[in-house]
Amino acid sequence: MIISEVKTDKERKDFIEISSKIYQKETNWIRPLDKDINAVFDKKLNKAFRKGEVVRWILMDKGNVIGRIAAFYSKKAKPEKNNLKVGGCGFFECINNQEAANLLFDTSKEWLKEKGYDSMDGPINFGERDKWWGCLAQGFEIEPNYLQNYGRDYYP
């Protein structure tokens, strides 16, 4: 497995399209518009970049994208009561493979550690709190709201 930071147009496309592969048989999943996902990572459109940073990765195995994740922090976030500096992760998608999932989360954790953060919260979104927060753990038979994280039954 090879994890790569998303930098090229192809990698940006792979980052978006992996969710379609993960949920291809899920009738209730609502695919977000590419522009809605891209807006989160666009410095011109997302005000969170003024006080924070985000990085995203895709995970490849044998030439196929098998997962993705993003990590981020905001300098305006106040330390928790226990004085921990908390960064975030989100946009996690992965095939049913624990080793792959661990690599994605560990990569996010290490990046945040390098930036001086002690802890990681997620799944959350870099920026506004009105979309892509939380993890669906049950209720897969119910159609979700648009811009709500979906999930697989093996995620929790």
Segments the model singles out, each with a brief description of its role:
Residues M1-K44:
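Short amphipathic alpha-helix that is part of the acyltransferase structural core
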Residues I2-E5, I58, G88:
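Conserved beta-strand positions that form and line the central face of beta-propeller blades
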Residues K13, E17-Q24, M60, D106, ...:
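A broad, structural surface signal
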Residues L33-I37, A77-N82:
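An N-terminal domain-start capping segment
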Residues D42-I58:
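A short helix-loop-beta-strand connector motif used in the catalytic cores of GNAT acetyltransferases and
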Residues V54-I69:
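Conserved beta-hairpin
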Residues Y73-K75:
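A short acidic/small-residue loop/turn micro-motif
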Residues P79-P156:
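Acyl-donor binding region in acyl/amide transferases
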